[in-house]
């Protein structure tokens, strides 16, 4: 039996302060913000963080530009968009959040234990860079629902996942939570820039 794990620790600057959200959950108050997290390379990830219940009172006192630490878990929910299509929203649900002085290097660590439920084909990018995508099913610690988390491996790690890990395998991941922009092409030829969120593997075990 899998001992599921789903933990995220982030620190960074609030690029957009917390705002009340409504529409998909009428039971508990929810508030969302955008957290900007710097990589060692200097590139910045902008990720959605969400507070619920009494934590919204703490979160909504924070201002844009504040440096904060967040501890939580990755969650997702499905909804019907204005286009009438089904969409999935991936975000970090906050268990703890606190304001602090800016660190020299932002924190970004994910710990996941779950099962592989989907495995994409190994892709090769320019300069022979390899990318392997998988979907990992894990649990939300404070909910009974599953979370199906997009995960990517790059370079030699991608080859390792491709050759040694298959659907239904239990996998233990240490990684980084990141945002990635891409262009979606529709049947009518129209292209739209969108953002997806995923875990990039830095270490894995079975």
What role is predicted for each listed range?
Residues 1-206:
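Single-stranded nucleic acid-binding surfaces, predominantly the OB-fold ssDNA-binding core
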């Amino acid at each position: 039996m899998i001992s599921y794990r789903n933990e995220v620790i982030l620190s960074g600057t609030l690029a957009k302060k917390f705002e009340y959200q409504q529409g998909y959950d009428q039971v508990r108050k929810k508030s969302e913000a955008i957290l900007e997290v710097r990589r060692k390379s200097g590139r910045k990830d902008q990720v959605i963080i969400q507070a619920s219940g009494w934590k919204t009172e703490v979160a909504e006192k924070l201002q844009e530009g504040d440096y904060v630490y967040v501890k939580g878990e990755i969650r997702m929910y499905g909804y019907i968009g204005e286009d009438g299509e089904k969409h999935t929203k991936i975000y970090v649900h906050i268990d703890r959040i606190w304001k602090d002085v800016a660190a020299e290097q932002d924190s970004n660590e994910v710990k996941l234990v779950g099962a592989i439920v989907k495995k994409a084909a190994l892709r090769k990018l320019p300069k022979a860079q390899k990318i392997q995508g998988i979907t990992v099913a894990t649990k939300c610690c404070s909910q009974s629902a599953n979370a199906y988390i997009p995960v990517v491996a790059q370079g030699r790690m991608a080859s390792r996942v491709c050759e040694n890990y298959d659907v239904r395998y239990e996998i233990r991941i240490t990684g980084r939570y990141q945002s990635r922009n891409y262009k979606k092409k529709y049947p009518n030829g129209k292209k739209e820039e969108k953002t997806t969120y995923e875990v990039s593997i830095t270490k894995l075990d079975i």
